[in-house]
Amino acid sequence: GLRADDWVPVTYNWHISRKDPAMMDFERRLPPILPPFDSVKPIDSKVRVHLAARRGNDFETESALVVTGPHGAFAASGYTHFATSPPPEASAQTGEAAFQWYINPFEFFRLAFTTDSVPKPDTTTVVGRRIYYSHIDGDGWRNQTEVTRYRATGMSSAEVILRETIKPFPDLPVTVGPIAGDLDPRWFGNRESLRVARDILALPWVEAGSHTYSHPLDWETLSEDAKQAAKENAVSRYSNLWNWWEETLWPFWERIAGSRSDMEVRETKEADQDPSAQEHSTRSSKFHRGHSQLRSYDLYPFDLDREIGGSIAFINGLLPAGKRVQLLQWSGTTLESAAAMDATRQAGVRNINGGDTRFDPEFDSYAWVAPLGRQVGRFHQIYSSDSNENTYTNLWNERYFGFRYLIQTLRNTESPRRVKPFNLYYHMFSGEKDPGLEAVLSNLAYARSQELAPVTASQYAGIVDGFYSAVIVEIGNRRWRVENRDGLNTIRFDQADKQAVDWANSQGVIGQRQYQGSLYVALDPAVNAPVIALADASPATVPYLLESRWPISHLKLEGNGSSFQAQGFGPGDMRWQTRPRARYVIRVACGHTPVRQMESVAGADGILRFTIGDRPSSAAFDPVQVTLQEVSGNP
């Protein structure tokens, strides 16, 4: 639908002749002097021009700069976004290039790929609410706190975090990943660091994670060195047994592996046996991708099995019966190899970290909103949804209060469009200084003020794994089957304010909610391959969930009522769409033991509101059975 004409290198006498405000000036206006461009003419009436320029009043020169059509879209180079390089003296906080969109990327790709009618796996929402999850990396576990009210006690930063940001918030689950080297007495652990770890990880709203054993900082170099060492160690081992190996195959290995001298190989083997041989644990290097060393702890040589499986096994040994590590929280550059990713799968845990999403006055663009993760071989590394305090404090060197500005990112990624869940991600060293601790507490207070559905960090990672694995099969007009979705239980339809779930032709659907012009459809985790059917919006024929703080499952419609399981954190607030003025009896049981019974009446709008109640913290992971029974009688 387009024809390319001449290149226009000089544009001083050109001006914008057409501009679609829904597409252009999204985050930044075009400069007064237009960038050079390839002149393009539409030759299909179905092509929609969103931006065009012409020379003076010569209409024949008009060139399309941004267009969409039935076969795709086109945007001229230089007209999509503004970007600069960072200054050489830029700090860790503002060292990124400035970047802002001229075009609206959401609108551009919506029209380019005609996605309005396409169901989208959604990773921001569960049971109609924005997801909340939190995780803490173990860095700074043993740091002696400088927080005023604890300074004289010699208390560790980890215990301050336990007392101030974990124990007082049983309604907000958190995943804690210690560095095993901070706890293991053979490394740098002691009885006190172990005691604090056991106290933290025993809490029922705390999920156990691992932040590795030695806290690798430069995963890329370590992975390369590990491959090299494996080849060299194999050569050294077998050459001592068979002389012919050294005489015939050693030159071959030397060529392909670039092996070190015999003395260096012996020193490496000695370092394996001697913990004090720290200088032999890694190759010498002065600077590694922003870090002055390869690992935080170089007491022993790098061992991928120890970093992943070993750290998980050690932390599992600190947990109460029935509890296990669920998540590997990547360290350092977070640029892991496929072998590292595979090790997490072999250990039976999810993974998270990387991404560093910011959207605030310092990083004022959707460009700094990171993707869900990255592909590593046949695996996916799951990114954290928000950045941690490192990027706000210049790697914990200044502006210790800076993490309080996370709230700006949380607001910008929720409105005008929800693009990320609420993720509170920080380190144990936030318990070291007063302003750092206060920043975390302010973010926790903000979380309590919001309408959220709290989940654990490993549950969020499972949701994103489901995004990557899900298969959506169209099985009819406005009807789809969702397969292989792992932990993902929300499907979103955009531009859908006039559509609704067709309950008679759907299976395994719990509820729906209209929000920001999109329709969020909640799926039942207990149904393996749910079916979603849509119809034009009209009053529903069955009660359905609008939103809930607690995720629910195993929904069954039974005569004049329904039953389901629910589990969550904090007050179990829920809203259901029913008949106007309908009266319900709500019964709650834990196993076969009745817990609570109450009555609630729907409003004139048919919305039934009730709260199951604060769950005892000791039962935070145990589901309850809920029955809704409509009863006769006037309210």
Whereabouts are the PLM-identified features?
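An acidic, glycine-rich "communication" segment
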Residues: 1-59, 487-489, 495-497
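Short, surface-exposed beta-strand/loop micro-motifs that present aromatic residues
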Residues: 59-73, 123, 410-414
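Extracellular ligand-binding/catalytic regions of CAZymes and related secreted enzymes
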Residues: 68-177, 434-465, 531-562, 567-568, ...
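Active-site beta->alpha N-cap acidic-glycine motif
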Residues: 95-219, 233-242, 246, 301, ...
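C-terminal domain-boundary segment and adjacent tail
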Residues: 108-128, 160-179, 184, 205, ...
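Catalytic domains of cell-wall/extracellular-matrix polysaccharide-remodeling enzymes
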Residues: 188-189, 299-378, 437, 606-613, ...
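Alpha-helical scaffold elements lining the catalytic groove of polysaccharide deacetylases
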Residues: 216-320, 372-414
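Non-catalytic C-terminal accessory domains or segments of carbohydrate-active enzymes
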Residues: 454-635
